[in-house]
Each structure stands twice: as structure tokens, then as C-alpha cells.
């Protein structure tokens, strides 16, 4: 069983020194979170200051939580909704024209439950272009969601999903192809 007295964060795991990490958390809790909804460019600017790769015309709400922005890539015209949590222990990439709806949680980190010291690990998440994750979707570490895929509200994604499909459920399963109407 686990003995947390032996737990430690691996050297370099955060991708930034302690000062950078603490400074980001202070900025996120204040001038990022307190900014008016319409100041998308301001929040994109702050994220870029901390090393995020942010495309043009990104919509990111002030209530979004990002653990380490230097591990985040947002493509052009990506939208990230209210109360989304981007747990960037590992890299998160969200493709152009993709929507991550409110209260969704993208989780790149976990612990080894078999390890006595509860070893922490991180695996990247990739959301393709033109995807839509509806409200309150959970995405597990290591998942890739193919271009054009829709994941229904309150779904949990534990395995990678192919391109151009509609999925839902816990665990999320493909229910049909996504066909463009225009």
C-alpha cells in the first residue's frame, strides 16, 4: 500500500522553476481570473508571457484553470469555455477551430497506484482540429481525439477516438459518423 511520506515531485517535472510556477499561479488567480469576459486577447497575452503557444483569435474565458501554461498549445480560433480545467502536468494541444465547453476537465497527470510512493506521471493529450467537447467532458491522460470529432456532454474519454465521429458515454463510444452539412 502507499506510503506518501516518500512521495516527491520529480526534478524538472513542472517544466519551470518554483518562482515561475508561483508567479503564474498568482497571475492566474488575479489579473487573469478577474479580467472581463471580452478581454480574450489580454488572457492570450498573459498565457504567451508564460510560454503557451496561442494561435490567433482564441477565445479563452477568465475562469479557465491552467496548471502550467508553458505546456499548452491552442490553435487558431480555438475556444475554451467557463470553468474548464486544463491540468497540464503533460502537454495539452487543442487544434484550430476546436471547442472545449464549460466545466470540461483535460487531465494529463495521474499516479501509479501500484507504486509504494504514489509516483506521479504525465502523458500528453491531443485534441484535433474542428473538434467539440460538450459540457463537462473528462479526458484522461494519453488520449488523442481525431479531427472533427464531437464528444457529448458529461462523457468520459479514456481511450483515443477516431476522426469525424460523434461519441458519448462513460466510457465514451462512437455512436455515428459526423457528417458536415455545409
PLM region spans:
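Beta-rich strand-turn-strand
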Residues: 135-159
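Terminal amphipathic alpha-helical/low-complexity segments used for targeting or macromolecular assembly
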Residues: 1-52, 56, 97, 130, ...
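A short, terminal or domain-edge coil/loop segment
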Residues: 13-17, 111-122, 149, 164
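Acidic, glycine-centered active-site loop in nucleotide-sugar glycosyltransferases
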Residues: 163, 168-171
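Flexible, glycine/small-residue-enriched loop-and-beta-strand segment within the central core
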Residues: 35-44, 61-74, 79-144, 170-171, ...
Amino acid at each position: 500500500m502507499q506510503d506518501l511520506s516518500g512521495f516527491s515531485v520529480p526534478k524538472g517535472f513542472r517544466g519551470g522553476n518554483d518562482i515561475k510556477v508561483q508567479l503564474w499561479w498568482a497571475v492566474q488567480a488575479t489579473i487573469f481570473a478577474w479580467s472581463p469576459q471580452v478581454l480574450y486577447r489580454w488572457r492570450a497575452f498573459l498565457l504567451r508571457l508564460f510560454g503557451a503557444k496561442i494561435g490567433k483569435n482564441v477565445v479563452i474565458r477568465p475562469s479557465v484553470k491552467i496548471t502550467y501554461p508553458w505546456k499548452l498549445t491552442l490553435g487558431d480560433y480555438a475556444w475554451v469555455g467557463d470553468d474548464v480545467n486544463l491540468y497540464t502536468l503533460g502537454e495539452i494541444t487543442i487544434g484550430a477551430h476546436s471547442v472545449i465547453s464549460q466545466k470540461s476537465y483535460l487531465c494529463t497527470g495521474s499516479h501509479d497506484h501500484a507504486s509504494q510512493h504514489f509516483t506521479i506521471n504525465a502523458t500528453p493529450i491531443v485534441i484535433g482540429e474542428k473538434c467539440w467537447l460538450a459540457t463537462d467532458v473528462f479526458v484522461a491522460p494519453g488520449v488523442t481525439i481525431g479531427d472533427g470529432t464531437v464528444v457529448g456532454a458529461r462523457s468520459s474519454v479514456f481511450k483515443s477516438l477516431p476522426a469525424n465521429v460523434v461519441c458519448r458515454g462513460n466510457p465514451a463510444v462512437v455512436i455515428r459518423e459526423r457528417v458536415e452539412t455545409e
